[in-house]
Amino acid sequence: MEADLLFLRKLMDCKVITALDGTILRELLNPLHDGSRFHLGYSIAHAIIPVGKTSLPHRLIKASEVYYILEGRGLMHVDAETKEVGPGSLIYIPPMTTQFLENTGTTNIVFLCIVDPYWRPDDEELVEVDE
């Protein structure tokens, strides 16, 4: 019997975790956990940064990331650059760059995070940033 080709996962069926950087996360799809049925080089997660909070400065060593902001407003910090972001903003974050997202708005920042190659715990590290 052939395996189902259509894969469907609902956000609310995904476990809520707190990521290393403090972001509230639901991993939607990651070949590391979801097995070899997916021919993907990336992972995708749904993330939230609550009002008044900031993710901890961190970097991915080998992977790049793309954030797509669904809701909320804030400041995206990548190395020495800072830009305002809001719904519809897409941010590319190269490997080995220090990054964090600061919620400056009145609602949660909700975004999708795509990591390529797919996210692995040994590829992420916290970084101390001088104020």
Q: What name fits each language-model region?
A:
Residues L29-H33, A45-L60:
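Conserved short histidine dyad/triad with adjacent acidic residue
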Residues K62-S64, I69-G74:
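Glycine- and acidic-residue-biased ligand/ion/polar-headgroup-sensing regions
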Residues A80-P95:
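Short acidic-glycine-tyrosine-enriched beta hairpin
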Residues P95-P121:
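Ligand-binding loop in jelly-roll beta-barrel domains
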Residues M1-G41, L126-E131:
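A short, N-terminal "cap"/entry segment at the start of jelly-roll beta-barrel domains
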Residues S36-H39, S55-L60, E102-T104:
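Short histidine-centered beta-strand/loop micro-motifs
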Residues R73-L75, T82, T98, N108:
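Structural motif
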Residues T54-L56, L75, I91, P95-L101:
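Histidine-centered metal-chelating micro-motifs
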